[in-house]
């Protein structure tokens, strides 16, 4: 399945198509968006976003703690959409 992922970035909001087997960060790059990232392995906070609607699967992440996940934070480099989802990007400063 392919879902609509709405990315709320500092430079505006854009909605992209993201298959359920593609990481949000990869789909964003294919769509020409320039989102922050570093390790691409779910083990740092460079790509942190915050889910404001919908859900993602980020089982591969190893950086965020349970409280951060419950608050909606997501590592876009290892997040698969589980439906239509809205993510605010560039949220690394909010989790430190």
From Swiss-Prot:
It comes from the Eukaryota. Pfam families: Fer2. InterPro entries: 2Fe-2S_ferredoxin-like_sf, 2Fe-2S_ferredoxin-type, 2Fe2S_fd_BS, Beta-grasp_dom_sf, Fd_pln. GO terms for biological process: electron transport chain. [2Fe-2S] cluster binds at residues 39, 44, 47, 77. NCBIfam families: fdx_plant. Ferredoxins are iron-sulfur proteins that transfer electrons in a wide variety of metabolic reactions. This is Ferredoxin-1. It comes from Phytolacca americana (American pokeweed).
């Amino acid at each position: 399945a392919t879902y609509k992922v709405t990315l709320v970035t500092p430079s505006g909001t854009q909605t992209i198509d993201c298959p359920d087997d593609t990481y949000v960060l990869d789909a964003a790059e294919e769509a020409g968006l320039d989102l922050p990232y570093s390790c691409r392995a779910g083990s740092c906070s460079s790509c942190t976003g915050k889910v404001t609607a919908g859900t993602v699967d980020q089982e591969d992440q190893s950086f965020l703690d349970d409280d951060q996940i419950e608050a909606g934070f997501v590592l876009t480099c290892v997040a698969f959409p589980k439906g239509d989802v809205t993510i605010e990007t560039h949220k690394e400063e909010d989790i430190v």
